[in-house]
Amino acid sequence: MGKNQPGYFGEFGGRYAPEILTEALEELESTYQKLKKSKKFKKELEFYLQNYVGRPSPLTYAERLTKQWGGARIWLKREDLNHTGAHKINNAIGQALIAKFMGKKRIIAETGAGQHGLATATVGAMFGMETVVYMGAVDVERQNLNAKKIEMLGAKILPVTAGEATLKEATSEAMRDWALNVSTTHYIVGSAIGPHPFPTIVRDLQSIIGKEARSQFKKRNHNLPHAIVACVGGGSNAIGMFHAFLKDKHVAIYGAEAGGLGPKPGEHSATLTYGKTGFLHGTKTLIIQDEAGQIVPAHSVSAGLDYPGVGPEHAYLSQTKRVDYRMVTDEQALDCFLEVTRVEGIIPALETAHAFYVARDVAKDLGKKKDLIICLSGRGDKDVTEVLRILGERSK
């Protein structure tokens, strides 16, 4: 597969997976190419997105936050209002339908914050498919509510204790499972990561976020926003938000990644700031690694951003400088989590709180009479217990 072929974004992307998965990846790619042109598939996907997920999600003007920050007008693309509470369901439904068309009876997923696991367990229940979710043991603890919901939906949750016991290890275990059960199983990759065609499939299924936001904003304001902001872990909500605006050169695009506790290796998940080119989970991308090329453990207060790699398209957008990626520390994200909750009456996910922090700076720089859209990727019910625990420790 050459760099100019599908699956590459500049030098990033491609398919670097074990040979045992080659046939499955080729089958997935050819099926997806057919389904993209199929009216039946499009109609079915649209039906579920409207009648089950509740799309289109609203574009909300955040009046009090706009006043509080004293800069650009703030708009929120409300992925938190989707069924299951985040953007992850857009992708899970699409991939479950692909699995159904391929005749696969079993679906598996990896999950960090639990939102993708929850979305996969939800579509598994709806389509009557056997569902297994791999989740790092550390994440099972800090995202216990989502872990319980996944089990309640009838999916089997398998805690992963290897390594850091977070998202990277959960992804590795899910890939191992897929390699062993490839004839019966489809792996619903949850972010815009992995070997081709996954980054493209996930991007396409999430691109509804940006398409809707662009048309909703245009309808109300007869122009486009001056800036858009989203948080980036693997980067599926962000690439879904960004994709529709990439050709609009006058729209500034910002990504917020996890600066964690600081710049030392092992303290953050800021792949686009500190990452070097390497290979992880079947793709060529930017990865947090040491001098010897070993992957360094990632850290973030938010389980969904706790990943030492990033989607290859984000690596490309960073390299070409189309998107400005900025780091946000745990502390800064927590402060924004509380501010947005108290000012707007919306509890954002800790992941999204990183985007709010970048948006606050950008809004002040833009000044009044300008407009900024934040992708509110998910709601923060799942984070309340963890935030209260951290605040309790702060006050000791």
UniProtKB/Swiss-Prot annotation:
Keyword Ligase annotated: no
Entry cofactors: pyridoxal 5'-phosphate
Residues that bear N6-(pyridoxal phosphate)lysine: 88
Pfam families linked: PALP (PF00291)
Superkingdom assignment: Bacteria
GO molecular function, one term: tryptophan synthase activity
A GO CC annotation given for this chain: cytoplasm
EC number: 4.2.1.20
Subunit structure: Tetramer of two alpha and two beta chains.
Task of the protein: The beta subunit is responsible for the synthesis of L-tryptophan from indole and L-serine.
Similarity comment: family membership: Belongs to the TrpB family.
Full protein name: Tryptophan synthase beta chain
Native organism: Leptospira biflexa serovar Patoc (strain Patoc 1 / ATCC 23582 / Paris)
